[in-house]
């Protein structure tokens, strides 16, 4: 499957999805659609469809945004230094869609690598496990629990 950013995909974004993914915005804590989602499946870029995170790597960090211990495929995320708002953080973007996803912090579960990928729900689309094969994500089924 080829993952890319397209004008058509951008045009389908809601105002909030556009603000987050294209203007490096952040959704308000506690408001994201996927914050409490516990269904098995994968999270893909809302713009390009590239697979980003597996439900098996999602955990409750109590930070107000969906949190993951690692990307489903390292090559699908890029990390950049973000010095906005008087802080130094590591921004996470999708590699193919170039969508702003959120940030990664070194305070995740130590036994799972020590990282916390703090991700905006507005940058994601959830693909339930029972739809993964039909939507072309069957190669990732072994990374999803259940």
Swiss-Prot record:
- Which Pfam family is one of this chain's hits? SelR
| Catalytic reaction annotation | L-methionyl-[protein] + [thioredoxin]-disulfide + H2O = L-methionyl-(R)-S-oxide-[protein] + [thioredoxin]-dithiol
GO CC terms: cytoplasm
Q: Which residues form the active site?
A: 118
Question: From which source organism is this entry?
Answer: Brucella melitensis biotype 1 (strain ATCC 23456 / CCUG 17765 / NCTC 10094 / 16M)
The keyword Oxidoreductase belongs to this UniProt entry's keyword annotation: yes
What GO biological process terms are annotated to this protein in UniProt?
protein repair; response to oxidative stress
Family membership, please give it.
Belongs to the MsrB Met sulfoxide reductase family.
Q: Which InterPro entries match?
A: Met_Sox_Rdtase_MsrB, Met_Sox_Rdtase_MsrB_dom, Mss4-like_sf
Q: What is its EC number?
A: 1.8.4.12
Please provide, alphabetically and separated by semicolons, the GO molecular function terms listed in this UniProt record.
peptide-methionine (R)-S-oxide reductase activity
Q: What name does UniProt use for this protein? A: Peptide methionine sulfoxide reductase MsrB
Q: Quote the gene name from the UniProt entry.
A: msrB
Top-rank taxon of the source lineage equals Bacteria
Top-level EC class, please?
oxidoreductase
Q: Does the keyword Cytoplasm apply?
A: no
What does the UniProt keyword field contain?
Answer: Oxidoreductase
